[in-house]
Amino acid sequence: MTHILIAEELQHEFKRELDYSTYILGTIAPDAVHAQSDFRVEQKERSHLFAEGLRWGQIRDEKDSQIWLESIKNYYLNNRHKYNIDFLLGYIVHLLADVYCSLHFYAPFVNGIDGNYEEKMAQFKRENYCVNYYFFENFSKKKNLDDILRKGQPITLKGIISKAVIERRIEQLLEFEFKRWDISHIEEQKICKIKDMECLIQGASLFIKKIFIDDYYLFGR
């Protein structure tokens, strides 16, 4: 849900009329690889446009972030006229949000783990599901995510992600990640706190506006 909320924060910054549903579908698409039965981390690196030599979960400094960022910008510049622009913008927003989150949230968390690594990662995953469901519940008071995603137009990005996998991801989100999670103890979470995640959404939105929309999107249109 954080990616969807970041995309919503930015939708009017593009100064063009967007097909909202396709834009939102684009922003959940990079993680569609999780819906593949033979999922491998290399598939996620490809869908997230990792430059050669970068590894998922190991973007922990400014140098790696900059290499990843340039790969994303170059992909946009080279493909902006080849694919549905609403879908592509949503896709790029997701990737740029991950660049920001890797450097400002995930890396500090991983680097600061003191104790059992596997236990902390399991706690992170569990808390992340809960906070996403919390945001989903709030979002659902005004909008129907099921309808939005099904109205969007999925596309295949050649060599990156397929339309069929994106369609499976919609089902996976609605049947698992956004099922009813017990969030009665969400205020006690230690890693993925609501306030911190809200700050992350705002920070990522400002970051994307500055380094892509203001400085690159208009130039690259």
Q: What spans do the regions from the language model cover?
A:
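N-terminal leader/auxiliary helical segments
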Residues: M1-R221
